[in-house]
Structure formats: C-alpha cells, structure tokens
Amino acid sequence: MSLIPATTEMLFAMGAGDKLVGAGSYDRYPPEVERLPKVGALLDPNIEQILTLKPDLVVVYGTQAELKNRLERANIPYYTYVHKGLPDISETIRSLGARVGVATRANTLADSIESGVQRIRSRVATRPRPKTLLVFGRERGSLRNIDASGGVGFLHDMLEAAGGADVLSDVRRQSVTMTTEMVLARAPEVILELRYGPPDAGDADDLRQWNVLAAVPAVKRQRISQLRGEQFVVPGPRVVTAVEQMARTLHPEAFR
C-alpha cells in the first residue's frame, strides 16, 4: 500500500502495481490506480481502512507518526519515504523494489532514469545557462504570493539538470515566497511557471500579469513559459520527461 503519489507511480513502473491493495487520495497516475481503494493522504490517512485492508507493507511519509504507531501495534511493516532531491528518486526505487520483491526490475528502472537525466545534461552542457526563476504557484490573476524553487530540492535539481541557473540558488530552502520587488532584484532571464490542471481561459491572463515587471530581462525578452503536468511536482519515474521539457524550453536549439 502506498499513500504517496511518487511511490505509487514507482511501484507501477517497476511492475509491482498488481501488489497494491490501496493508494493515496491524491494518487492519479497511472490510470490503473483508479481501481484501488483510496486510503487518505499525508494529513488525513484513514487508519482504520488501512488496517482493514491488511497490507503486508505500507509506504508512509516520515511525519505520519500516529499512522506509524498504529501500524507497529498491528505488526504491519512500513517503509518511510524520504525525498530531498533528484538522486533520491533512483535510491527510493532501488530500495523499495528490494522490499517488494522486484529488485531486478527496480534497478533497471532506476538505471534508465539516471541515464535519461544524464543524456539531457550532456545535451545542454555546453550551452550558456540562463538565470531562471522556477515558479510552482501564485495567486491566479495576480503576482501575489509567488512560490518559487529555492536553491535545494527536487525542483532545483531538475532545473539545473535542464541547463538553467537557478536565480535563487543561494537560498538554501526548497521553496521561497517572493514579492515582485524580489523578482525585480533577482532579474531572471527566463521565468518558468509550472501548471498542473488542464489549460483554461485564465492561463493567458496569468502570463500577461508579468508585463508589469517590464524591467525584468525575462519579461523584456518575452522568455516566460508555462509548463504543464504533474510530472513536474511528483518526483517519480516521469522525471526524465519533466527535465527534457524544461531543457527544450530553456535550450530549444539543442534539440533541433
């Protein structure tokens, strides 16, 4: 059982999806996950339902202390998910694959991810690295509460692998809430915005909001792009696709 979108994807990708007896409420990929009972998520695990399903192993977040205590009392083993950066994806796949009895397939998957990311790194290695602001959230229709990737973590690692220079690389946090004044001071040459749902009528208006920061190089040169898909925020097997999408946006000439 997995309560975490990333590890649920990993288990399916390594060929262990048929072993799952339950999944997290926010687990949406692959489509086969929809057949599974939903047992809550980080803040609201349905502990009674989890125990009723009698899993042999539960993948949990490190902060789910109450759930882990109940699992221990029921003699149900758990695997604690830890994720800080890009290398943790392969490490988690290898260790989780060993726990569920598909080590060979898990190692093959991890090798494929590592080689895929390295292929993209090599492709953009000689290109100038534009100063990039990677935004993963803000208030719709405004430039308030701009949530951006800081200088550590999964998003930062993806951006660096894609050939961008994180404009917040000196801030040793995974995320930074920025004001427009901070964006002006950092002067990014490229702005990448991550979007998660289907396209809607507000997307174009959201892009236009940046025009008020005309002094920012990315705005002046119209180097602002929206990148869409959950693969950008779920640190799992689709990370190679996410890194390549970033790289193609930052360095289109490298993929011609």
Where are these regions (language model features)?
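A short, structured surface patch at a secondary-structure boundary
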Residues: 1-53, 57-67, 164-167, 195, ...
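Short, structured coil segments at secondary-structure junctions
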Residues: 16, 35, 74-76, 162, ...
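His/Asp/Glu-enriched short active-site or ligand-binding loop at hydrolase and phosphoryl-transfer sites
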Residues: 24, 149-175, 195, 226
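Short, charged, surface-exposed secondary-structure boundary motifs
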Residues: 29-37, 49, 88-93, 204, ...
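Short helices/loops that flank or line small-molecule/ion binding pockets
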Residues: 47-54, 73-74, 178-187
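A ligand-binding cleft/hinge motif common to bilobed small-molecule-binding domains
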Residues: 65-73, 190-209
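Extracytoplasmic substrate-binding proteins
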Residues: 66-143, 165-170, 222-256
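Acidic/histidine-enriched, beta-strand-rich ligand/metal-binding domains
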Residues: 172-174, 182, 190, 196-197, ...
